[in-house]
Amino acid sequence: MHVGELLKALEELGLKDNTVVMYSTDNGPHYNTWPDAGTTPFRSEKNSNWEGAYRVPAFVRWPGKFPAGTTLNGIVSHEDWLPTFAAIAGDTTVKERLLKGTTINGRSYRNHLDGYNQLDYLSGKVKESPRNEFWYVNDDAQIVAARYQDWKVVFLENRGQAFGVWREPFVELRAPLIFNLRRDPFEKAQHNSNTYNDWWLDRAFVLVPIQGLAAKFLMTMKDYPPSQTPGAFNLSKIEEQLRNAGGGK
């Protein structure tokens, strides 16, 4: 169903003013299926560590609640929609309750939600997004990069091109790459600037707070470990998963 048809149906049913509509996509384009995959001005594509893999458009409509025709430039993640939609439905404490453990509809849950309630930001009650950070996690569950405000630090780099991003490994960098996404949103300075390395050295201090945030984030995995391991095409990883599932046999 096209978006326009869905919006028209909501209006015909008298639900337009009482329905939140959010339109987005789960990841950046997959170029080898162009033109169906779309395109992006940002660097690289799905399954990389670059902005083209993670940064996507999002449109939200809630007549009378969210200001129309407004562009917001703060950091918002898809992880934020669960606590945001819960807040819209009247539950503003779901994140805190899940952290401690709670019962919902007769079922017990204890989960760590990384999302932020963006309701006040989307409605215009506050000017800044409550989210200052974003963790770039690949499909192997590796943290390949981190963002704090305008700064992005790349720990693992996928150097593949086109379908090669699926074949090439993520390379661990001894010295992470640094980008300022306000001044260099397309992450070109690394290759285009004659003075990138000098600029990097003058801003290496950025690594300290981001490494501290990364350590804090990773500590949450101790009390709230991942519930499952990601799938893999690599035979050694598949063998490891089978061995773990069989208790080492």
Name the predicted role of every residue range.
Residues M1-W34:
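Metal-dependent active-site segment of extracytoplasmic phospho-/sulfohydrolases and closely related
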